[in-house]
Amino acid sequence: MTVENAKALFFERNLCALTPLDPERASAFLADLEARAREEELAGVVALLGRKKAADFLSAILDLSPFIREALTRQPRILDRIVSATPESALEAILDEISASGTVAGVSESELMTSLRQLKREAHVLIALCDLARIFNTETTTDRLTDLAEACTGAAVRFLLLDADAAGRINLPDRSNPEKDCGWIVLGMGKFGARELNYSSDIDLIVFIDETKPAIGDPYECVDTFSRLTRRLVRILQDRTGDGYVFRVDLRLRPDPGSTPLAIPVGAALHYYEGRGQNWERAAMIKARPVAGDRLSGKQILAELSPYVWRKYLDYAAIADVHSIKRQIHAHKGHGDIAVRGHNVKLGRGGIREIEFFVQTQQLIAGGRFPELRGNQTVPMLARLAERGWITQQARDALAQEYWFLRDVEHRIQMIADEQTHILPEDDEGFARVSHMMGYADPAEFSEIFLAALKVVEKQYAALFEQAPELGAASGNLVFTGDVDDPGTLETLSAMGYERSSDICRVIRTWHFGRYRATQSAEARERLTELTPALLKAFAETRRADESLLRFDGFLQGLPAGIQLFSLLQSNPRLLNLLVMIMSAAPRLADIITRNPHVFDGLLDPAIFSEVPTRAYLEERLRAFLGSATDFEEVLDRLRIFAAEHRFLIGIRLLTGAINGVRAGQAFSDLAELMVGRALEAVEAELQRRHGKVKGAKVALLAMGKLGSRELTAGSDVDLILLYDHDKDAEESDGEKPLAPSKYYIRLTQRLIAALSAPTAEGVLYEVDMRLRPSGNKGPVATHIEAFGKYQRNDAWTWEHMALTRARPIHGDEAFIARIKVDIEDVLAMPRDVRKLAGDVREMRELIAQEKPPRDDWDLKLKPGGIIDLEFIAQFATLAGYVKKTPRPFATEEVLANLDPFFADPAMVDGLVEAHRFYTNLSQAIRLCLNDSAGLDQFPPGMRELLCRVAGLPDIERIEYELLEHYRLVRAAFDKLVGHGAD
């Protein structure tokens, strides 16, 4: 407040000369106001408007501020308050009326709402008039706006306390002073707490409950009681009625607002801040101040929070915290020039936020050691920082001057329409309104002065952080503090390629609130904060940035801890890029690591990409992983964990190109053999514990299908047949609960199937398919070796002999396995009518084509000329004796490569082998990335890039062309070798 004429009436003082945009329009507005004053018989106001000084000043304001014009025209008695009283005393009278309104006997909630809205409008207009006239300086304006908000909040709180007491929900110790010891703590935050409110501010509140206070009734109901009161408080202040609103209320600065009640017990709040409080919350608490309710308890909780806000020692961790906040607020180095029109006075470059943050960061670093630096107001703290030598006198003076200048501009932007905006209008008239209200009739002059102010602030702000480590991963605002979307951040995310910027902001704020196990520790959140710009940049470089980042969020939700992974990603760009590749290209792998985050642990092995996963490699690691585990369930759980991790790691090698599709098929098969064999051993031991052994028992597992040919893909089930033998005189097992041999091995097989395929907390080992056993699902699940041989020699269909070409014993008694191999080779070597064989194969292929037609050109298996045709050629050639290699190969590609020249000429063989390898590389990648069969339109963009890489081709169109060529070649070969050309 200016000292001169402090006791003079408003229009007796020296007023800032303002000029309207349109003098004629201004005169018309003044005439309308005079007419309204006459209607309400306000003789003093009519006389005032007849005086030139008042008329000139008010007509300019009526033209420049539509909001003030509407308020005065609607309520001209506002001016009557300053006809015979000083503006200071008039404002005090309004504040007194507001304060008393909450305790008026018999007043209803709706009556209070009406009274507060009308009185607030009167005070608002008076403060604006004093501000525009320069009767109040900017500091006084913010102070009076804060007084107004505090009076309104206090009145509403007192009304609600008395109402709750009358209803018996609380027990006030003193109804004449309802706030005393009520236990309802209302803290003002941000500009409200710092007494720096702007003209159209929201008021930021945090509400706590002191459960120890006598007013609290049932402590188990107090959260619900005071949350209801808080909700009513918001309604009283915020709801729009015919009289407008009082103040918009924001409760989102409370701890974890997405999952906590509106009113939080003090103990729960302290626990949150001590364990999960974030950097920005430390900064926010600097400005916290009790503004209503139980103020004594409010001061006590702030005192208890002091060690959290003010760290005792100045250390590198504290400085790193500050830099972390800085990166969340701005990362704009290298941006273009500042544009005045459309500039955000609060959040833009050189704006108010930078000055506030300049002060708060110094306070966070030094306030622990120097209590005098713990104030909650910006400009006084600039002075304290200069006194302590933390900033220069020049910086203090420059920033203080520009702070009040920018706050002035902010107020005038908001005075136009009473909207909470901080953006300078871009249109000529809107910009001129602000310029004129600032006292500049020439907008160009105002523009020049405004730009100079921004540059001063930007220079000081940049100097403060010139030593801050740069992530170099993003440009533009990246602000994820609080619970409100930052407009600049939304723009930055959109520019980076995100389509759902608001959703992405919400997700990242969830990380910061520590709602996931991986982000509950302060250190983990700090690491993730450091990593976030790099993550955003990496995901933005995929073609579906939003989808990929949301998959990463799902991964975080399942992660048991985060520090190690976040540190690893931060220090290892290759691993970060790999994770992004998984999220963008391989939904199936992303789902796996989301459900089982432990599989990612394998990537900590630095040799993961250089060592090929051979059977010996896997055996060595399995032995170490199982260790001394002997308990049946423990062994199975360890097998499940091991299998999940190594399936994932084989997939990662394929994804990154460390191995090709053929090698991946071999590795997936080797892993499955080990897992199935070790599971059988565990099941046998468990069965023997209860039922003993069968005399002369011999057991073996026969791998069929792709496991037999060592061509498993990611997610393949395993085709198995369990074969057994025993002494002829064995009638039952020798255990406590003996079983007949046939029942014994059926029980063994059933338990093996359960061990492999039962869903558990650690997942499923493998889905098992045993339909290739003799008689399929109609036959027993375990097959005696003699029954197996007899069936294959006498009763098996051609398709069963085709399947037998891929049969391979993978686990069991060595002598028994040797016998099985001989039996299989004898069956395969049986003399056959080649023409009938070819006819059977053709008939089977035609049946498949009818019952399972190909989905599209990407159905590599079922498409004519696809994988089935190649497998049928290989199986037909094996049964017909057209494979020249000994011992007989199992893998389709190896069979094709060894076709007898008189059956298929070398050029055809080369074409078939090339086609099979092309299909294998593509199908392995597709099965790795997707859970289900899908067409091209469902392939994620990152997966398309992967397919181009594994195919060695530049684009999808070229792959499709090559596919069609291979289909044509293979189909022609099938027709020649197996089709009617073979007859």
UniProtKB/Swiss-Prot annotation:
It comes from Brucella melitensis biotype 1 (strain ATCC 23456 / CCUG 17765 / NCTC 10094 / 16M). CDD domains: NT_GlnE_GlnD_like. Pfam families: GlnD_UR_UTase (PF08335), GlnE (PF03710). The gene is glnE. Keywords: ATP-binding, Magnesium, Multifunctional enzyme, Nucleotide-binding, Nucleotidyltransferase, Transferase. GO terms for cellular component: cytosol. GO terms for molecular function: [glutamate-ammonia-ligase] adenylyltransferase activity; [glutamine synthetase]-adenylyl-L-tyrosine phosphorylase activity; ATP binding; magnesium ion binding. Involved in the regulation of glutamine synthetase GlnA, a key enzyme in the process to assimilate ammonia. When cellular nitrogen levels are high, the C-terminal adenylyl transferase (AT) inactivates GlnA by covalent transfer of an adenylyl group from ATP to specific tyrosine residue of GlnA, thus reducing its activity. Conversely, when nitrogen levels are low, the N-terminal adenylyl removase (AR) activates GlnA by removing the adenylyl group by phosphorolysis, increasing its activity. Its cofactor is Mg(2+). This is Bifunctional glutamine synthetase adenylyltransferase/adenylyl-removing enzyme.
